[in-house]
Amino acid sequence: MARISKEEQEVVKNKIISVSRKLFNEVGFDKTSTKSISKEAGIAEGTIFNYFSSKDEIFFEVFYSEYFDNVEKGLSRSIENNDIINEITENIYNILKNMLRLPKKVLLEMGLVTIKIAKKKPEFFRKMASIDFKYMEEVQHYLDRLIIEKKLSFFDSRIMSEIIFGSIVYEISMYLYENKMPKSDLKNNLNIKISTLLKGYIIGGK
């Protein structure tokens, strides 16, 4: 790599990520090439490989890093009315919004690319798994706050967060499998499951 400052390197890397995100969204993973990325970014194709080892790695960086950043922000919205189940659903669903704005085709490609990368580079699979664990941890902390605030009676928040995460994975899978299923159905189904899990623990309200 030519001797350029760290700041300039960061600019180039971010440009590659930005352009790649645009192309992946518009034409999909398979029809996007490192050549088309370099052309759109205004750089030599070889420059891309100074920052990423493959198109798969770019794809991972574009979508999973964005999702991780959203998870890192945590679940911070407070309960503002008596409809606690709806508020809990909204808060938990909120982290998923950025990912679900992607076309279903891109989301399916994310799964396929993840499996492909996991076989070649286990460290990327571990990174992906760490995002899921972080999400469950944030849900657990969120439930703990509601217990401390006397919105919910005591239960094992770690186990509950794992069950909720399993429900989320199932609903996302159904959303991707059912071509005509809208995001609103995913959210409503998640609301029903959260209601089933937590309605017996609500203190007052509904």
Predicted segments, located by residue:
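N-terminal intrinsically disordered/low-complexity leader segments
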Residues: 1-11, 205-206
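Amphipathic alpha-helical packing segments from all-alpha helical-bundle domains
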Residues: 122-149, 158-162, 188
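Amphipathic alpha-helical segments used for helix-helix packing
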Residues: 100-126, 173-177
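Hydrophobic alpha-helical connector segments
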Residues: 61, 75-105, 160-164, 187-190
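Helix-turn-helix
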Residues: 15, 23-57, 61-62
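Solvent-exposed, amphipathic alpha-helical segments
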Residues: 15, 19-27, 74-77, 163, ...
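Generic hydrophobic, amphipathic alpha-helix propensity
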Residues: 12-21, 37, 62-66, 70, ...
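C-terminal peripheral helix-coil segments that are non-catalytic and often amphipathic
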Residues: 90, 94-101, 137, 141-148, ...
